[in-house]
């Protein structure tokens, strides 16, 4: 099986990971940090809002079972891409909406989907999602991995 990677930031990574993990064709997920300026940051480092990292989910998927475009649709459907550095009550640059692409094809698909969602009328505000080349992914501490599943929860309850 040939797999591909996709990396997304869409708020607190616990709920984002749970959403992607359940998709048919997704072989694995990992939560972590990306897009910042500190090597191997801790959760506390990232929460300080001084590292520039986003909380992200790295998704490994089988493109013969689920396409990158389908994964993008799930991304857009499960967060608010119009709020800068915030999702719900969570505020800070680590909660920004970001797509980290792993290939020129992913970049093109992400840009096209952002344009389509922006023009769809679904949101009455500007879509602020960033689209950037995938930087080094720093895996988060083990207690964050599959956080909601370990606690028998299906979503974040704040």
Would you name each region that the model predicts?
Residues 1-158:
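Flexible coil/turn and secondary-structure edge motifs
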């Amino acid at each position: 099986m040939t797999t591909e990677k996709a990396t997304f930031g869409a708020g607190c990574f616990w709920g984002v990971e749970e959403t992607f993990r359940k998709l048919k064709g997704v072989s694995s997920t990992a939560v972590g940090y990306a897009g910042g300026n500190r090597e191997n940051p801790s959760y506390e480092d990232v929460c300080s809002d001084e590292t520039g990292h986003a909380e992200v989910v790295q998704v490994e998927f089988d493109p013969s079972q689920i396409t990158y475009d389908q994964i993008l649709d799930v991304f857009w459907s499960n967060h608010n891409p119009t709020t800068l550095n915030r999702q719900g009550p969570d505020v800070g640059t680590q909660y920004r909406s970001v797509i980290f692409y792993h290939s020129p094809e992913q970049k093109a698909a992400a840009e096209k989907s952002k344009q389509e969602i922006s023009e769809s009328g679904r949101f009455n505000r500007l879509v602020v999602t960033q689209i950037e080349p995938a930087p080094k992914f720093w895996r988060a501490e083990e207690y964050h991995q599959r956080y909601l599943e370990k606690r028998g929860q299906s979503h974040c309850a704040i």
